[in-house]
Amino acid sequence: MIEVLMIEDDIELAEFLSEFLLQHGIHVTNYDEPYTGISAANTQNYDLLLLDLTLPNLDGLEVCRRISKQKHIPIIISSARSDVEDKIKALDYGADDYLPKPYDPKELLARIQSLLRRSHKKEEVSEPGDANIFRVDKDSREVYMHEKKLDLTRAEYEILSLLISKKGYVFSRESIAIESESINPESSNKSIDVIIGRLRSKIEKNPKQPQYIISVRGIGYKLEY
């Protein structure tokens, strides 16, 4: 599922857009306070940012500038401010598109899909040759590393395939437990850590200095390669 970060202080609008986009396979996480939105952008991995400009405590143009300096993420400005100078500054600060309010949510959906298509094409051109280190066979519930089958328990398969499904995305321990069928959702964080440790022993050259399964302090884990 596509993950969109929204920074919008109009809660009613945010809820309306979130419900509409979810019907089209796009999950939206909204923050109505810009500093928490910036923190989320820097600690989580999203496919796209939908950003309002008129925000409390910090102007959206500055939010755009800060996030685009720290993260490579497509940005759509969604704002009632239609001044040409705002549009120019937003694009200069890293925005990819500018959609003046009010607008039809179907137009927003079309712009999101178009921007993500362009973004993915760029990734395909620049993706290094090691992009296919891992391969998941969902029918046989097996994971291959460099085309060699890994000997995994059911829980190990579920966690590793989850991490592979969204490379670079930070999964909390709680979400890992919820998404893994064989793990009790109420399992302790320690239980998840133990399984991660076993996985590292099977895929890492040096489990104590992992290069694939990376710990994100205070949150959980992500897969990088």
From Swiss-Prot:
The top of its lineage is: Bacteria, Pseudomonadati, Campylobacterota, Epsilonproteobacteria, Campylobacterales
Free-text description of this protein's post-translational modifications in UniProt: Phosphorylated on Asp-52 by ArsS.
* One GO term (biological process): regulation of DNA-templated transcription
Q: Which organism is it from?
A: Helicobacter pylori (strain ATCC 700392 / 26695) (Campylobacter pylori)
Residues in the DNA-binding region annotation = 123-225
Protein function: Member of the two-component regulatory system ArsS/ArsR that regulates genes involved in biofilm formation and acid adaptation by acting on major ammonia-producing pathways. Upon phosphorylation by ArsS, functions as a transcription regulator by direct binding to promoter regions of target genes including ureA, amiE and amiF to positively regulate their expression in response to acidic pH. Negatively autoregulates its expression.
Q: Which residues form the Response regulatory domain?
A: 3-116
Pfam families attached to this UniProt entry = Response_reg, Trans_reg_C
Query: Could you give one GO CC term from the UniProt record?
Result: protein-DNA complex
Which terms does the record give in the GO molecular function aspect? DNA-binding transcription activator activity; DNA-binding transcription repressor activity; phosphorelay response regulator activity; transcription cis-regulatory region binding
Q: Which InterPro entries match?
A: CheY-like_superfamily, OmpR/PhoB-type_DNA-bd, Sig_transdc_resp-reg_C-effctor, Sig_transdc_resp-reg_receiver, WalR-like, WH-like_DNA-bd_sf
Q: Which residues carry this modification: 4-aspartylphosphate?
A: D52
What is the primary gene name for this protein?
A: arsR
What protein am I looking at?
Transcriptional regulatory protein ArsR
